[in-house]
């Protein structure tokens, strides 16, 4: 009973409640794809992207990255240059994917009620700016050289077909729903198990005595400079490795509340400043397991993949720490 109600329903249900927002995002991306506009945007952006060491072709994968990192990384296969392809793969995860929207929505509603839209837009801009900075660093270090000339056949403009848009939309939304009932489903069960039992596999009455608490408490000091050291918060970040949507569902399970009341529960674990630091960290830290697996497949190198994960975690920690520490001084 506890597994079904407190684990599965609380976890998967809280994630599915954000499906309308995510479907809306995918709907507009699908329209842009079907009209032939994407290719023209790539052509227009070529001159600008060359300043940071990329070609216009890199723009399309990074734009898709705002929907999901997995198809975005796979889309880099269309890039002719191996240099451009690898560089685009490294930068794409900095484009905030739709799976992070539930996290932004919950925290913005709880801590930035008057400025929800501004904070969310600010997060997206932060990701883009960080991506540009990282690109400039890579351009002058590991990826010296010039991007290949831009050559692309531009398709004719056309009115979007309802059938084509519907198929594109379903393909993208289906992936989100499948993850909710597979990756997030199993992640929720694992989190429930770790929260319910202690090291001796005895059922605990207080979740602070659970296996999950031990893991969260072990890593929580790392996040103290960022303003959040609550084991429930750090544990939710661990679950975020399985799927970013799982961060919200894990918090809902650990705080024994529903998504609707999660904002109230979060006020006891965060200040406004630490909430902003958490959002910045969540924006920038390593993408989900599916995206990491795709990076491994495209780069064909475990060492480079591990390097990408470590680099993103370090960038996220440094930026989150800067936000909290500088904010505390003001």
In which residue ranges do the predicted regions lie?
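Extended, low-charge hydrophobic alpha-helical regions
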Residues: 1-8, 12, 52, 73-85, ...
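Alpha-helical transmembrane segments of polytopic integral membrane proteins
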Residues: 21-29, 34, 38-42, 69-76, ...
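Juxtamembrane inter-helical linkers in multi-pass membrane proteins
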Residues: 39-69, 144-168, 212-214, 256-257
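Conserved phosphate-handling catalytic cores of large alpha/beta enzymes
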Residues: 71-149, 252
